[in-house]
Every structure is written in C-alpha cells, then in structure tokens.
Amino acid sequence: MEAYHKPDQQKLQALKDTANRLRISSIQATTAAGSGHPTSCCSAAEIMAVLFFHTMRYKALDPRNPHNDRFVLSKGHAAPILYAVWAEAGFLPESELLNLRKINSDLDGHPVPKQAFTDVATGSLGQGLGAACGMAYTGKYFDKASYRVYCMLGDGELSEGSVWEAMAFASIYKLDNLVAILDINRLGQSDPAPLQHQMDIYQKRCEAFGWNAVIVDGHSVEELCKAFGQVKNQPTAIIAKTFKGRGITGIEDKESWHGKPLPKNMADQIIQEISGQIQSKKKILATPPEEDAPSVDITNIRMPTPPNYKVGDKIATRKAYGQALAKLGHASNRIIALDGDTKNSTFSELFKKEHPDRFIECYIAEQNMVSIAVGCATRDRTVPFCSTFAAFFTRAFDQIRMAAISESNINLCGSHCGVSIGEDGPSQMALEDLAMFRSIPMSTVFYPSDGVATEKAVELAANTKGICFIRTSRPENAIIYKQHEDFQIGQAKVVLKNKDDQVTVIGAGVTLHEALAAADLLKREKINIRVLDPFTIKPLDKKLILDSARATKGRILTVEDHYYEGGIGEAVASAVVGEPGVTVTRLAVSQVPRSGKPAELLKMFGIDRDAIAQAVRGLVTRA
C-alpha cells in the first residue's frame, strides 16, 4: 500500500457528496421497504464513501474478482448502505435499491452471497471479523497477494466474545493486511452501547489485543482518508466516532430509532435537506486492483493412492482422519487444516507435520475457528478442514448456521463422539452433534466406521459443496472394508447379510462394531441379523434401508452412541415413516452420562452388543 497523500479539496468534496448520496439512497430504500435500519446506515456514510471510493482497490463490475480488496459488513443490518455503494459504483441499477427486502429481489434485509459483492452472510452479529481474518490470512500466507481486507463492525456487536477471539487471532498472525473499522455511533438496539463514546477505552482494548488503533472523527472524510493511509506491521483498527442517524434532523443521536424507516413525508423533507449539501453529481470511479493473486483450482481433488489398511487391522477413526487429511494435502496445496488446540487428539497434527505452512492453529476459540474457515474458503481460494472434539462444535452452532447461509464450503471433523470416549466424562462427549449438523441446510453428515471409510469421507468432503461434518471416534476398531471399496454420499453398506435375516440393525462407528459382535452372539441362537452401515447420516440411503427392512419382516433396530433426539434413529424413522409394515426400534443414550470405561458405559446406556442382542430377541419373539 502506498504512503498517505492528502487528497485535494475537490476529491474531499466529492467524497462528502458521495457519502450524502449513500445516505439518501439508504433512506429512500428503507422507506420504500417499510422496514430496515436507516440510522445505522447514516452513521457509516463517510466511512463507506472513503473506503470504496478512495481507499479500496477493486473492479466495480466484477465484485468477486480474486485480485479485489475484500470488504465484510459485520454490522449486517446496515445492508442498504452496502447496496447503495454498489449502485454508486455502477454494479447495481439505482432503481433496484427501491426493491430492498422484496421477495423477488436479491437485496435481502441483511447481506447474503446471492449478491455477487457479498462473500459471507452477516447479520448475526460478532462474526464478520472472524471471516475477514480468514480472508486476510489467506491473502497473506496462501495467495501471497496484495489485496487487503476491510471489515466494518458496529459498537453494539463489540460485546460479543467472538469479536475478541478474532482480534486475538489477527494479532497472533500479524495480519497487517487487515483493517477493522469500528462504527462507534453510541447507540445499540434498545439502549446505548455500554461504552457509548468513550473512545479511549475502545482504543486501549484494541491496543491490548495487539492492534494499531486510531481514533478518528467518523464523519470527517479527511481524517478517514489519513487513517486508512497509515501502514503498520500489525492489524489496524480505525475507531470512528460517529452519530447514529447522522444527517437526519431531529433523529440524529436519538434513542428509539433503531430499525425504523422514516415515514415518507419525513423522508422527503430529509432527502431535500441532504440534497442541498451535495455540490456535484459527478461520481468517483473505483480504483482497479493490482493483479497478483494466483489462479487456483480446487475441483476434483483426489487421494494420490488407495487406503493402506488391511481388513482386521485396528485403528481409531480419529487417527484415520489425520492420516487421510495429511495424504490429501499432497494432492492439492489448497487443502488447509485448522484446529482448536486439540491436534494431538484429533490427529490433525499429522497434517501439520507434513504441511506446516497450511496448518492454522486457532487455539481454544471454536467460534472463531469456524469463521476463519469460512473466510479462507471465500472465492474458492482454499478447501478448509476444521477439527476439534465434536462436543465443542456445539458452541459454534451459530457460526455453522451462518456458514450455511453464506453458502460456504467448509469441512468440520468432530472427534471424541459419544460415551465411548470413556473416563473423561460427559463434558467431553458429543451426544448432540448429529442433531445439530443434520439441522443445517444442505449439510452432509459423514459417520465412517473404519479407516477405509474415513479416508473416503475425507476425499468426498473435499469435493462436496456445503457444510460437511465427519464424526470420528476414539476407540480403535477393526478395518472391515477392503482398500478399493467404493463409497458414495447417500449410499449405505450392507456389512452382514444372510437369506433368513430376522432384523435389520443399523449402527455407525462404535455401534456398528457392537452390532457385528451381537450378530455373532445371536448366530449361536440361530438368529441372523442384517447389519447396515449408513456411512452418511445425511443424506440417508432410504432405498437400501427399506429394501433391507422388507427382507427382515419390516423390523429395523437402530443403535447409536448419541442421544435419542436428532440422531440415527430419528433419521431412519423419518425416512421410513408411512411405510406399511415397517417398524423402527431405537437404542441410544437416554440421559447425561458419567465417567467410566468405554465398555462399561456402552453397557450402562444399553448400546453394547448384549443390549443389541437382547433387543433383537425381543423383536423376534414379539412376532
């Protein structure tokens, strides 16, 4: 970035005029919509004008060009001013702004990626900076390109802990290509923000987190130009003192106007007042970027060799995940791994050992880790794999939910699922994760049961759009598949089959192996069962499940190391509901567990081989 040169008076006036046009557009759009946040837009007008028409480098007619500077509107409720910017730049027709929030318009109430200029969906506050950190990390360390990343936050969202997780991350990794703009307009939604206009405290907090922090008058285009022109070898926070509703007579800096459009008669009067301050209608052209981002292809990434496991060998699927990811890393230098300080448990350390420059340690900040991954994945620059204990992904549920709204392609591996982890106890046991990930739109939920299946899951996830979750286990279990076994999403496997099977038993991970052990017990009693491995819990192989059920007198037994709610049993029951003559019996963890040996806990909660065998006997004798 070049050293700061003060713009001449003509440019400064043009920026003031641009800011006022953005104000007018925001007021017009929200009044036409009958809803929206004009006051939140008006506090940011000068910031947005200086950013997009003085500081940033981008191609106005190609918003997703990989060379462009990036912008994240973390305070997503100010979407109308973002849309106004892209109309001012010439990408959107100005008439489209009046379709804000209409069902047939792409201009939603908050930014979403169906808009070409939006990389990540925002509106659930506190998440934009984490995504911006992921973009900046990618720009600095993977692309090694000159594009910069800007993120505007509101003061209300600075109460979110995830913001400070991101602040810490940016400092640790010296993201000097990242600028956060804090729009300190004093007022939150229902009350003033906790610090109101105590700018020095904001500055001290940012500096304490390792940022270069600059206080500016957020309505002075000259001060903003100077602040954006400062170059430091650390991330920069521009702390802008602004006023909510700036330029709206009678409403500026007044409470109780959050999220309220102006009535038409008031809007017309205010627009007339603001228009009177505009000296020229001439628009400022966007400055094009330096074109130094490498071309990237993340399609069709395949394992270099087949799985190197032999049937009967034992390995935990969590370790097989680490080995698979390290292996896939050799197929593409755009495979990256992130972990939350659990890499020696999730085995992502194996990836770090072989590809140290593509491993991102996110420390114990799971919410931020997911946001970082979302940022890294934008514009198809990388294929991220995040790992931690599956239980700890639950604290990032909102980030995962927003990742789906962002149409992000990220892969999450949750280890240590279920009571089978043993002595560590319930705080470490994932028993809700399947329910959580199944509820995410367009998600794919893998639950591999051996090393071969795990390796295939990793490869498939890398090439699958949307949120992919891979559930791995702590216990070592036998390899049951040959190395060339073909796996596909939504395709279950019949692991054990006889002509006279009495019950179809569906298990995954540890419980699949317990089902196979139960089959041996039952065989001595001349009771045969069919054992299915679903491989993906979402989508589920409904056809194979129904075919198997019909071949076993309509009896299905599911067994899972998960709570009853939202897991395999409910997925299977939903798939076969309404099918005549088909019944589903479920075995799952029924209450909060405790510490103990894995075998003791499986037995205590009725999901071990003996419980499966007993349930099968009950189904057979009931006929």
From Swiss-Prot:
InterPro entries noted in UniProt: THDP-binding, Transketo_C/PFOR_II, Transketolase-like, Transketolase-like_Pyr-bd, Transketolase_BS, Transketolase_C, Transketolase_CS, Transketolase_N
Annotated function: Catalyzes the transfer of a two-carbon ketol group from a ketose donor to an aldose acceptor, via a covalent intermediate with the cofactor thiamine pyrophosphate.
Cross-link (Glycyl lysine isopeptide (Lys-Gly) (interchain with G-Cter in SUMO2)): K352
GO MF terms held by the record: metal ion binding; thiamine pyrophosphate binding; transketolase activity
Residues recorded as bearing Phosphothreonine in the entry: T287
Catalytic reaction(s) noted: D-sedoheptulose 7-phosphate + D-glyceraldehyde 3-phosphate = aldehydo-D-ribose 5-phosphate + D-xylulose 5-phosphate
EC number: 2.2.1.1
Any Gene Ontology biological process: pentose-phosphate shunt, non-oxidative branch
Active site residues per record: E366
Quaternary state and interactors: Homodimer.
Family per similarity comment: Belongs to the transketolase family.
PROSITE patterns associated with the record: TRANSKETOLASE_1 (PS00801), TRANSKETOLASE_2 (PS00802)
Modified sites of kind N6-acetyllysine: K6, K11, K144, K204, K232, K241, K260, K538, K603
UniProt keyword annotation of ATP-binding present: no
Entry GO CC: endoplasmic reticulum membrane
Binding site for Mg(2+): D155, N185, L187
Annotated Pfam families: Transket_pyr, Transketolase_C, Transketolase_N
Cofactor: record remark: Binds 1 Mg(2+) ion per subunit. Can also utilize other divalent metal cations, such as Ca(2+), Mn(2+) and Co(2+).
The organism of origin for this protein: Bos taurus (Bovine)
Name the UniProt record assigns to this protein: Transketolase
Named cofactor requirement(s): Mg(2+); Ca(2+); Mn(2+); Co(2+)
UniProtKB keywords: Acetylation, Calcium, Isopeptide bond, Magnesium, Metal-binding, Phosphoprotein, Thiamine pyrophosphate, Transferase, Ubl conjugation
Highest taxon, organism lineage: Eukaryota
Binding site for substrate: H37, H258, R318, S345, H416, D424, R474
CDD domains reported for this sequence: TPP_PYR_DXS_TK_like, TPP_TK
